[in-house]
Amino acid sequence: MGVFTYENDTTSTVPPAKLFKAVVHDADLIVPKVVDSIKTVEILEGNGGPGTVKKLTFVEGGQTLYVLHKVEAIDDAKFEYNYSIVGGVGISDIVEKISFEAKLFEGPNGGSVGKMIVKYHTKGDAKPIEKEVEEGKAKGDALFKAIEAYVLANPNYN
């Protein structure tokens, strides 16, 4: 198995505690409202904490696809969230899983800085397809910004 690591940083004007709550604890409700392609997020097993497996159903290229999202760790005090995409028909055949390590920090002017480490665990000695990696980064950035926009548009969100 090969492991290929990529890092991505982003910023937000939303404070870390509020953004973490939206991205981690309320995302199952927010995401289908703010991302047209994502139709449902359902818990298949667990209670939302580590070990929970979620099914994200989305439409891409006119096809209904899904991925299985496994929660690995949540640390509310440190604003850390680790999860993996562990299966589904929306994941490349050469990928065993994709692991994400996300952390929010205090940013300038009361906002946040987000750091994401993404690890592609490939089958055998296969390398991730660069186009798929770039598309994944773009989708992740768009998802983050959509949740941020929801929080900003709903000032009473807590």
UniProtKB/Swiss-Prot annotation:
One of its GO terms (cellular component) is cytoplasm. GO terms for biological process: abscisic acid-activated signaling pathway; defense response. InterPro entries: Bet_v_I/MLP (IPR000916), Bet_v_I_allergen (IPR024949), Plant_def-hormone_signal (IPR050279), START-like_dom_sf (IPR023393). One of its GO terms (molecular function) is abscisic acid binding. Keywords: Pathogenesis-related protein, Plant defense. It comes from the Eukaryota. Belongs to the BetVI family. This is ABA-responsive protein ABR18. It comes from Pisum sativum (Garden pea).
